[in-house]
A protein has these predicted regions:
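C-terminal beta-rich recognition modules with glycine/proline-rich loops and embedded aromatic residues
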Residues: 45, 118-224, 249, 258, ...
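Structural helix-adjacent loops and short alpha-helical linkers that scaffold large soluble proteins
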Residues: 33-46, 53, 104-119, 227
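Carbohydrate-binding/catalytic loop surfaces
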Residues: 3-28, 62-90, 137-161
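Conserved nucleotide-binding/hydrolysis modules and their immediate coupling elements
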Residues: 263
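Beta-strand-rich binding/interaction modules
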Residues: 228-249
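Well-ordered alpha-helical segments within folded domains of soluble proteins
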Residues: 17-34, 86-105, 164-174
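Long, well-ordered core segments of solenoidal/helical folds
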Residues: 1-9, 44-61, 123-134
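Extracellular Ig-like/FN3 beta-sandwich strand-entry sites
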Residues: 230, 272-274
């Protein structure tokens, strides 16, 4: 009652609370909604998601510096960049965040909210759990993500911490994030080369997804139903898309889908039908909080880009980002500022290098 009742009334119970334990507890509310049908729990989850993503969240999708929720509108996320290196309890937090997003997608009837939940799940995956320092066989495990002015990925000082368990659970859940079935068809939530086979009525259908996303903008789906069948295929169109996404079927344009919604394709599908989705990506800036709009993260598509091996702290130096960043290698961009070259790469590509996550907008 201390969590779900205030959330259902639109209140914010999070400030000062332990971050992970409260987010993972939200999944019990999802189970209550699915079992009892009480809309209180559905409303509570929707409000919790809104609060987490608009008042607590770093650009990576992480939250809870020092494992504690901040008080919104006081600039505390910004302050934490200088006061701690423990910005997100990553394996546990990503496990809780992705589990919550899956429940919300399952129970959403609003295509815009469905897309929003999928967008954030994708953000969390790429920039937190997939961006940790790789564990080793000796029990050295990542625990916290660090977003300090000059940051470094390190292991937790003790072997086999609690997060070593949730890291494995999160990895095991990767396939659960890709596709969602419904009585009318299939929803594609994430874009990664994969294959799914399912029963739709009396037909068996296989969908094969091929892509180099997010390094590239295009995703291809090939369908293999064992008989002609009508069903609906929906594709998430991220809100960050630089323009409308284009969809072709068997090479013929069929729809331009607006960012932040779903592309809905209902037709009579046959063996070998091919769907091609192109999602335009471009750089954008995201402020750390509402008190510090000049302190920004550099984003492209679902990915947070960081400055690699900075020779000095860049957080206070005004930079004209995104400016005219030059593409010098796959997912690697560069620009010259004040006579020196700065390299920008996705946070998930960093292992042993130092990096900067937030910059001052020029």
């Amino acid at each position: 009652a201390g969590l779900f009742d205030p959330l259902a009334r639109g209140k914010d119970p999070f400030p000062g609370q332990h971050a992970y334990s409260h987010v993972i507890a939200l999944s019990s509310g999802a189970s209550a909604y699915l079992t009892l049908g009480d809309p209180k729990y559905r409303d509570a989850l929707a409000n919790a998601f809104k609060l987490l993503t608009t008042t607590q969240q770093f650009a990576s999708g992480g939250w809870g510096p020092n494992e504690t929720f901040i008080t919104p509108h006081r600039g505390e996320l910004y302050d934490s960049l200088a006061t701690t290196v423990d910005h997100f309890e990553t394996p546990c937090g990503s496990y809780a965040a992705t589990k919550l997003a899956r429940y919300l997608i399952r129970t959403s009837a609003d295509p815009h909210l469905t897309a929003q939940y999928g967008d954030n799940l994708e953000r969390v995956l790429y920039n937190t759990i997939l961006a940790v320092k790789s564990p080793d066989s000796n029990g050295d495990y990542p625990y916290y993500s660090t977003y300090s002015p000059i940051a470094e990925k390190v292991y937790y000082p003790k072997k086999w911490p609690c997060c070593s368990g949730t890291l494995v659970q999160t990895v095991a859940d990767y396939p659960l994030n890709l596709y969602f079935r419904s009585p009318t068809g299939l929803h594609v939530n994430l874009y990664a080369s994969s294959q799914i086979t399912w029963k739709q009525g009396s037909s068996t259908i296989t969908l094969i997804q091929n892509t180099n996303y997010p390094a590239e903008d295009t995703i291809t789906f090939t369908l293999h139903p064992d008989s002609l069948i009508n069903f609906t295929l929906t594709l998430r169109i991220p809100a960050w898309a630089a323009a409308a996404a284009s969809v072709t079927i068997n090479g013929k344009p069929v729809i331009k889908a607006a960012p932040g919604t779903l592309a809905t394709l209902r037709r009579r599908w046959q063996q070998g039908d091919t769907v091609t989705l192109t999602i335009p990506q471009d750089f954008r800036l995201e402020p750390i909080d509402d008190r510090h709009p000049e302190t920004v993260a550099l984003m492209r598509g679902p990915l947070q880009y960081v400055a690699l091996n900075p020779t000095q702290a860049l957080d206070k130096e005004p930079l004209p980002l995104p400016g005219s960043l030059k593409h010098i290698a796959p997912q690697v961009f560069a620009e010259n500022y004040s006579g020196r070259q700065i390299i920008f790469v996705p946070l998930y590509q960093v292992q042993n290098e130092t990096y900067t996550t937030y910059f001052t907008r020029a």
